[in-house]
């Protein structure tokens, strides 16, 4: 019987780093997170997949044209959450310097309020549930990559951990 201690340690490391990222990144500040949430909100509200229209500014922007499987699963996961504060969360930081190399001040795209503090409610709770779902998917990717490397290079026991 094979020992999967190295895989377990790798998954623990992955989950630890992902959890630190989850807790240290404000709501909607991860890459395109606000727009992905906009797609999920459309589906969870029963409006189906968003329709892309040229020149129309929406809460989902270009993400409305992405493949829908993740969005359908994510919408099901957050459908029970009352996102009463969703539209107010799209409040841009007028002084934000997003994408400016070397910036150390005003690095956030959105304004952040005490709605992001514990206990988690509304949009913040929904975003964290989705992040945890993404971490679970990431664990599957790490494990699958480990097994593929192990199958392709059975003589090199350390390669799958890379």
State the predicted function of each range.
Residues 38, 71, 75, 143-147:
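Transmembrane alpha-helix boundary and packing residues in multipass membrane permease domains
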Residues 35-39, 69, 134:
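Hydrophobic side chains within alpha-helical segments
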Residues 5-8, 98, 104-121, 145-162:
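Transmembrane-helix signature of polytopic, membrane-embedded enzymes
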Residues 27, 68-69, 155:
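Hydrophobic residues in alpha-helical membrane-spanning segments
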Residues 4-34, 41-60, 80-88:
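Transmembrane signal-anchor helices characteristic of membrane glycosylation enzymes that use polyprenol
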Residues 44-133:
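Interfacial juxtamembrane loops and adjacent helix segments
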Residues 33, 66-70, 142:
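Short alpha-helical patches at coil-to-helix transitions and adjacent helical residues
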Residues 1-19, 129-130, 137-146, 150-151, ...:
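Start-transfer (signal-anchor) and selected internal transmembrane alpha helices
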């Amino acid at each position: 019987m094979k020992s999967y201690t190295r895989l377990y340690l790798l998954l623990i490391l992955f989950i630890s780093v992902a959890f630190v990222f989850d807790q240290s990144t404000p709501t909607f500040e991860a890459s395109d997170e606000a727009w992905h949430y906009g797609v999920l909100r459309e589906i969870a509200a029963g409006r189906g997949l968003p329709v892309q229209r040229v020149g129309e500014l929406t809460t989902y922007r270009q993400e409305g044209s992405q493949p829908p499987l993740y969005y359908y699963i994510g919408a099901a996961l957050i459908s029970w959450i009352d996102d009463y504060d969703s539209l107010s969360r799209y409040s841009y930081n007028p002084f934000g310097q997003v994408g400016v190399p070397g910036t150390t001040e005003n690095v956030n795209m959105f304004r952040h309020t005490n709605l992001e503090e514990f206990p988690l409610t509304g949009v913040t709770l929904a975003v964290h549930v989705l992040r945890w779902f993404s971490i679970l998917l990431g664990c599957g990717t790490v494990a699958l990559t480990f097994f593929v490397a192990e199958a392709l290079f059975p003589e090199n026991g350390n390669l799958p951990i890379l």
